[in-house]
Amino acid sequence: MIQASTHVVCSPLIAEVYALLFAAKISCRLQLQQGSFLTDNLPLAKMAASRDINNTIISWRCRQPISEFFQISHSLNVVYHISRNTNGIAHNCAHQVLNSRVEPVFSCSRSSHANVPCPFLQSLLNFQVQGYVIHAVHCL
């Protein structure tokens, strides 16, 4: 689980778009071969599924980050819509990040990483993406 924030958002939709983009960048950094992205925003999920940047369902402000998401996630292109109730954990985590301004927390509780450095934490320890701040990384 990764908690991060960005200051380039002006609406919940834009926040969701930038969250998808950041997830794609993390997936690339971790060199994931497969992946799925979850969103509770149905129009965004439909646009991502169609991979149509000119889809009028979504605000024009989303087109640049969505375009970048498409470029980065071409092999990880599965975006699923989930209900807002199902997405409660992500919603709560987002509010935790907004309410806390502490140093980043990196932790691993995987038993398979007990005797070796966690490869996920090692990969993300110095990972920086312009416009984003990582607040927590928990390898579960």
Where are these regions (language model features)?
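Primary recognition of RNase H-like, Mg2+-dependent phosphodiesterase/nuclease domains
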Residues: 1-140
